[in-house]
């Protein structure tokens, strides 16, 4: 009998030990699972070891907040099933089959996208679930804060605005939506007045605010935020479509750390046919170049997660789609009230949150589609300058790094940024860190793609073809059109020295119009061994835009395994099978840097 009692006591002791140890083992396993792949001894550690250590510290702080709360599957399975059965124009995010009559310019004139097509697609259309498969099984905190969803608009199309609202209502748990606040920035279209009021009266959670004069996007957002009652403020644009289970992943991160700003993955809704698809490269970190253009850069190996559906840190947000704890937003001062209309605000809020004690993440399991307009369909008030906004952000937040912007944009030096005393005082009261800290701890991978000091170019000037004596020219081309040969103009006096025949073979191994100090954002691009050479948006990811200028004067294109060639008869420039003895495949740059070229061609 005593032996049985002894065994029973041993079993109880083991059970108690398990109760003590297992939660810690589980948390350790969870912690290990969330570590970046880069090991302390790997190549990434040599890049920015302190930044990686600080990242680990930030992850641990976020991990344990709310760890003991109950979790829940927030998916609306019934709604997902119904959506899967929908058929019709644009359903499942498929392109609308357009006719020539539907492509007319008038369709785009008022909105910057094809409103005729938008009007023919259901307000409740289904979207493809293009999240990572792991998102389907993710659980989030059972108790989440609610949110006020702020949607500013100015002269927005009827169907595109309503589809935005419908998508939010259809794909958001009702208990998480405190309200949807539509903020009208002084629209003058009749359908956005009483007809909109009458329609939105059908939805108790929707209310409309209106400005008394044209305020611009930034102040309109601020008006909506000041009226918000939810625990969290979520900003959307007025031509978006929220995808499946988009909201809980955002609110979960804020519930675990109230000083986290979270951004959904922004998918592309085509402005022509309204097809729904991911952005090129999908999950990438937000960044900028030193002219303050927004850029996207790959997630470095040091930051990649074992589970690609997990949230990841991003230095800079894309713009108007994000969620933030309401009280934290106002502790940060909201948007700088001195910023005019639009532009630069995403940098201001990004720098501010990182430097002043917060963090920012992109959430792969939250996806929202956005129509990228063909062009901006309205004029902003006279005297408003994007440059002024960027100068203001640089003066308040970028410290000595602002000089790199002024070197590239000398016209910014003497531009008035307005009174920034209050903003600098706010920065001081929040005990914000320096911009150098931001660049070394948060955006440490940015200089690899966009160095503050531009490395020397490999070659520049005119590109003259040996066989024809003609020069590469862009004057007849628009973005996406083929390059052409034209009579060389360099020798006709300094007045003829212009960017139409001036190119730079940059340190990125791409070729861009312009001299080394003033290159444009377009690159030589080729897709196959017989394709024309076109100008395309530079992506700095090599691929179709990678070139090698070889000692035999050929411009070799590694992706297609071919060389740039030309035709004297019709002045075409195209790719062809490499033939070093062919004079039409030999090209002379006006200036070359032999050291840089040797480094390029070393392998």
Curated annotation (Swiss-Prot):
Cofactor: Mn(2+)
Tissues where this protein is expressed: Highly expressed in the sublingual gland, testis, small intestine, colon and ovary. Expressed at intermediate level in heart, brain, spleen, lung, stomach, cervix and uterus.
InterPro entries: GalNAc-T, Glyco_trans_2-like, Nucleotide-diphossugar_trans, Ricin_B-like_lectins, Ricin_B_lectin
Alphabetical list of Gene3D superfamilies matching this protein: 2.80.10.50, Spore Coat Polysaccharide Biosynthesis Protein SpsA, Chain A (3.90.550.10)
This enzyme's EC code(s): 2.4.1.41
Keyword Iron carried by entry: no
One Gene Ontology cellular component: Golgi apparatus
Glycosylation sites: 124, 146, 593
Signal in keyword set: no
Disulfide bonds: 135-365, 356-432, 471-488, 523-538, 563-578
Chain segments carrying region Catalytic subdomain B: 311-373
Chain segments annotated as transmembrane: 12-31
Domain Ricin B-type lectin, chain residue ranges per copy: 458-590
Subcellular location: Golgi apparatus membrane
Example GO biological process: O-glycan processing
The entry's keywords: Disulfide bond, Glycoprotein, Glycosyltransferase, Golgi apparatus, Lectin, Manganese, Membrane, Metal-binding, Signal-anchor, Transferase, Transmembrane, Transmembrane helix
Residues at which substrate binds: 185, 214, 238, 342, 373, 378
Free-text comment on this protein's domains from its UniProt entry: There are two conserved domains in the glycosyltransferase region: the N-terminal domain (domain A, also called GT1 motif), which is probably involved in manganese coordination and substrate binding and the C-terminal domain (domain B, also called Gal/GalNAc-T motif), which is probably involved in catalytic reaction and UDP-Gal binding. The ricin B-type lectin domain binds to GalNAc and contributes to the glycopeptide specificity.
Protein name per Swiss-Prot or TrEMBL: Polypeptide N-acetylgalactosaminyltransferase 10
Species of the source: Rattus norvegicus
